[in-house]
Amino acid sequence: MRNVNWGSVTATADGGDFKRPAPGGYVARLVSLEDNDAKQYVEAVFDIAEGEFANYYSDDWGQSHPYAHHFFLSYKDTALGMLKGRLESIQASNPGFDPFAAWDAGRLDMFTNRLVGINLQEEEYEYNGEVKTRLNVCQVVPVQDVRDGKVKPRDTKKLDGGNAPSTAPAVVAAPATNVYAGPIPFN
């Protein structure tokens, strides 16, 4: 165990003054992009680049939990329109950068440190039978839309009825009726 200079540490209560970003628009910086060829998508990990929450995910927790601050660029045939829209948002946010040329050249490293606007939406999920919330990217936009206040928070994405945790048992057994009570015909 290491010695700590307690004189330089400010005490906080458990849960303390931890503040997380609210749903809505943020200017984000792309930290890394990784291709998953089998599933036909690129996972884009981001950090918030401007404002009160700049570098929010750059701490140890954020670096070890990239799934908490990422979005996908799917290149399945059915999602190419959305991919093009997201690449156009990256292009509008980074004058002089051609994300289409970088994409076609397979140079995902060229996206690192590029800016993009994102809209974070709160969504419900179930964990150990309890409903919790997390932030997820619901929209990728040009950074100027965020700066101009054009990006509005969306309502919380609720669990649908089929996924909501239930306190009732899944199957209720009916009482047995007309049960055979005679001798067992085989031994």
Residue spans for each PLM region:
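Short beta-rich binding modules
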Residues: 1-187
